[in-house]
Amino acid sequence: MQADWGIVGLGNPLAGDDGVGCWLAERLRKTFPSRWIHDLGADMLKIQALQPYPKQLILLDALRSGAKPGSLHYLSEEKLLQSPTTAAAHGFGLKGTLGLLRQTDDAFCKIKREWRLIEVEQIHQPFVLSPTVQAGAEQLFKQLQ
């Protein structure tokens, strides 16, 4: 049965704030265990093993755009792909991964997708979120409940 909505978290939890999408997905999955919520880590292509997809998908990830750390960004996929910050994304890179999914996965193309991103402060060790990014993640967590 196809879920009405779902959430995936993306990022590298071993790289500080870059793991904020995974952190949020894990927290939401514990809060809503029966919902379609998954932590994909740094490999967005793993989503193909999770079919059937929900009708609407919220993708959670980190962003480095120069805005205040912890700031929340709501971007369309097209606008995100135009951003120069996508070069250091996950796996093949965000553009490559989305391009591959769009070319090979008809079901993925039919999903309504929304990106919710949190501005990072640091992407390195230690393996914890910085306080400002955690505050932004807490704010987004409350919005998604």
Q: What residues fall within each predicted segment?
A:
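N-terminal catalytic or cofactor-binding beta/alpha core of small enzyme domains
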Residues: 1-122, 127-138, 143-145
